[in-house]
Amino acid sequence: MIVQAEHLNKWYGRVIALNDVSLSIPPGITGLLGPNGAGKTSFMRILIGLMRESSGTMRVLGERPWNNPKLAVRIGYCPEHDGFYEGMTGRQFITSLARIRGVKDCAAAAARAIDWVRMADAADRKILTYSRGMRQRIKIAQAVVHQPELLVLDEPLTGSDPLVRQELIALIKSFAQEGRSVIVSSHVLHEIEQLTRRIVLIHRGRLVAEGDIRNIRDLIDRHPHTVEVKADRPRDLAAALAREPEVVEIRFDPTAVWVRTPHPDAFYAKLPKIALDAGTEVREISSPDDNLEAVFKYLTET
């Protein structure tokens, strides 16, 4: 295992950031999922040795991360928020960090990292001129310039446009394909689905679930859903839906029907025929429960 945590706790005064987290992370790519404020960043900061746990233990690549400079150079870290010297060029920034990490040929290492993130054409421009996507690539370049065994990425895809997101996903995958490991955090399930099937779910500082992403998808599909169905004749549709065993609660207004169902898969499968038989046209279907927040709430309340 590349990471092992046992009864890990972190608190800031009365605020609990991590609450008795025990987990093991194998080699490869692992997604760390949770809403904002879940404890993901605190977990990552302990993992890279930037912060000490309040109690419990964390081992990374077999070693304790706190106050361990030899381990630190085996890890690459890309923070969520920018921390650039804006007046530097991308090349100067990466070269400086390579030097701090003790890389022997800093210029050559920086050039390799810049080429790897496809920033050679803009490497000698000042960072203050970079777009968000370019800044993200430079942040990833500094995280890999010393060729770490483990790459830790905190919300690397946040705010990126679709094209940049796909480019970043390809870079992360290529790093892992070289036999190294990645831990990447996100609060968006479909982002992680494009990277890996191995995920860890954290909510309010607690480990909620871990394992194959398909199992998490099953949780999303199986937990009770509230479904909004916009239709041209909501009253007629509501009357038809009220007879269905999958529906446990129903209400409607002049534009839509809201249904509560413990069996969303069966409900979605039957809805088209029910609407057709009721002589109503379904215009839109949506569910506020088809997301990670709802899964976290469901798991922590059951």
Predicted regions and their residues:
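A short linear hydrophobic-aromatic micro-motif
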Residues: 118, 246-251, 281-286
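ABC transporter nucleotide-binding domains
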Residues: 2-5, 10-203, 208-209
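C-terminal coupling/interaction segments
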Residues: 263-302
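Alpha-helix N-cap/helix-start and coil->helix boundary motif
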Residues: 9, 65, 91, 189, ...
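ABC transporter nucleotide-binding domain
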Residues: 169-262
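A generic structural signal for secondary-structure junctions
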Residues: 102, 139, 218-222, 246, ...
